Amino acid sequence: VADVQVIARTQAWHFDPPDLETKATPILLELTNNSDRSIVVRYDHIALTDAAGHRIDVIPPYNVQGTVSVPVTVQQPYYFTSSYTYAPYAYRFSPTYLRSGGGYAGGFAYDPQYYQPYLTVYTDVALPTPEMLQRALNEGPIEPGAAAGGFVYFKKIRRGEQILTLHVDIIDQASGNVMGTANIPFVAH
């Protein structure tokens, strides 16, 4: 589209949740308006089509559904201690300020059967995550000389050697008319 640059990137999601692509297909869109008119970004004017012409609409970021599993870690644990030492095998998990004594020196057996399920804890988190919303492309105007970028989300696309085309309508803000459409082909593999 003349004077409006549209760049689309797949496999650009490197944020939380790290396994988002198992539930949705994020595509990073960057639009630069080099025209002398204000244009508008509208979700209902962004879509993918397959070779058969089937349309896959953008899912507004606040409507992405599903859950992903994320690891849970304690960032700043609180330890109350009074004349306390810790098991020798727990040294690497203990806060730095407790490490000076080297841990309990007596017999203290480690029971791997008990601790195995607790080594890594995962929890289900509902989509969309706060980071998905923060990194989403917002609907709205792009003034002349300005740019906007962010992720748009589609349903999970099955991998295979299918050709998909991303269609982004460039809409004139004043009239609401489509000035043109950027068509960007992709191979889903």
How does the language model describe each region?
Residues 1, 45-52, 93, 102-189:
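Surface-exposed edge beta-strand/loop patches
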Residues 20-28, 148-149:
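Short, solvent-exposed loop/turn segments enriched in Ser/Thr/Gly
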Residues 29-38:
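Asparagine-centered strand-capping/turn motif at beta-strand->loop junctions
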Residues 37-45, 58-59, 164-165:
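Short, hydrophobic/aromatic beta-strand segments
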Residues 46-100:
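Structured domain cores in non-transmembrane regions
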